[in-house]
Structure formats: C-alpha cells, structure tokens
C-alpha cells in the first residue's frame, strides 16, 4: 500500500489542476436547466427499473418500456400468485434473449419441502439453472419469516442455518441477494391507523399476510432482526434490501440501516408512496435522505405484468405510474396522491442524483447485467 502523498505533493497537484483550469478558460456555472431534468425529459433519459415481475411474452410491456427509456430487471419470486418458478425462469430467459441489453433477471428458489433433507440439493439445482442462463441475483421473499413453517410449526427466519450454504455461496461469488423481509409497518396496524390507502387495499385482499389479525405470528421487529443477523454474519454479501428495507415509514430508519450495513443498497419499489407521504409532512427530510444516500438507492416500481399481454390499458397505467415517479423525483411540482389526503411537492433532485437512482446504482450493483454481449 502506498503512503498518502504529503502536503507538498498535494499542493503541486492542486496547482497543476488550477493551471489547467486557467488555460482552458473559466467555465460558466451550469444553468439551472442543465443541472436538473424536466418532466419532458422522461422518455429521453436512459433508465433502469430494477424491480419488476414480467411474465409471458410481454410484447406490449416491452414496447412501452423501450419507448419510456427503460431497461428492466425482472425478478423471479416464490409467490403463489405468480406462475411456477420454472415458468417464471423460462419467461425471463426468453425476454433476455429477445431483448438483448434491455432485460436482466434475478432467480429464486422454492421453499417447498424445506423440512426435508432433500430440500438443499433441490434449491441448489434451481439456482444453478438460473445462473447458467444468465441470472444476476437471487431473491428471497417475505414467505421466509411470515409463512414458511418448520416441522415443529415454528416460523422459519432468514437467518436459519439451512440457508447458510446459499448465502455463503452468494457472498463468495459476489452475487447479489435481493431481500424482501417483513412488510410495511402498516401490516401490523389496524386499518384506521394505516398511513396509505394502497396498504389497506392490499391487506384486505391478502388477509393471510395481515399480521395485525395474526398476533401469534412473528413481529415486524423480530423478522428484521433475523435479517440483520444474517447480514452481520455475511459482511461481504451484496444485499439489495428491496422496498426500502421494510423501513419505509421513516427515512431515518432506512438511513440507520444503510449506515449499519455498508454493503447494502435499497430500492424504492412499491414504496414511493411512503416517501411522498413523508414529503407531504417534511419534504426537506426526504430530500436530504435521497441526497445523502444517492449512491445506494435504486429505482424500482414493483410492476407485475403478464402472462396476459392483451390489454393496452394496463400498459398505459404502467406508463402513468412511471411518469408520476419521475415527476416526484425531478420536478418541484405540487402533486396529489390517491393514497392519502393533502398535497406534496416534487423533490427536484439534481440530474446527477437522478441518474444514479435511475441507472448508475443498478449498473454498479449488478455489473454487466444489461450488457448485450454478456454470456450466459
């Protein structure tokens, strides 16, 4: 390791830089228009939606994504409402082949038969198949901690020793683990105390995940504590804590998580509304959070699309949501949300920060995932 340069060396470097600047002529300060994007720039800026779930042929969806300037990371999930994992994998591989440089995907594994001695080998085979076909990450879902039970009836947590070979492999091979553990804190609150209407709607439609009605199930704190123990045991693991790390109700909590785990990033998928809710009350706090952690936040929408590809209205709604997110981050417009009462303003982030959130952080985390020449 080389020693840090001394004061004299630093002075010489600074003097040389100053001389170069003078020789080139003093550059005029960037205009406000050059430092910020506008709403109209949306379709002209290269972006990555690093959290979608796309099934089937998805030709309409991909046409809209391309028109809107998006590359995508489609994430396979062990979710009963989605197609079987093998079918999800085939759809993701097909998309990647049909849209080279535009689509990347993350694999997952089934927890079916988890209590069986044969489970570990089956999970390994699923992951091997995904990696062989180009997967750039692995997703673990909220069923771990909220649904999966062991042979004795206890809930299986993310730090269970049987996951250790998988996590250790990802850490060793520098493969990203995407983790959705727990749910919004609203999940543990009565309906009348929930902050946003979309959470009320989701938990009415999915009562099996509405933890307020299931006090016998693990608490929000217990699930996240198990996740954090897993991360402490694997300090070199690259971890994408999706959905603002399930700490969406307070950006200070998200900040503390990022400070504790320097190899973790977060995405905003399906949690932008919680940032908007906080911005309606303290916009500068939310803006400061995004500015401070600009290198560790990824844009994601959590769009689920397909396998039906016949409804143009569905694609139009996705475009509208993408555009609304862009408006919130890049403009200072006065806005309203269907999810809560009251107005809020866009955060008007500098374009350098917007580029990181919308593209550069995903490229850095997932390497050459969207390289059209990347081999399987």
What are these regions (language model features)?
Residues 48-52, 72-75, 103-107, 138-140, ...:
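Hydrophobic faces of well-ordered beta-strands that scaffold small-molecule active sites
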Residues 34-40, 90-211, 215-216, 265, ...:
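Active-site gating/metal-coordination segments in enzymes
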Residues 1-7:
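N-terminal secretory signal peptides that target proteins for export/translocation
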Residues 51-59, 78-88, 112-121, 148, ...:
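Acidic-and-aromatic substrate-binding clefts and catalytic sites of carbohydrate-active enzymes
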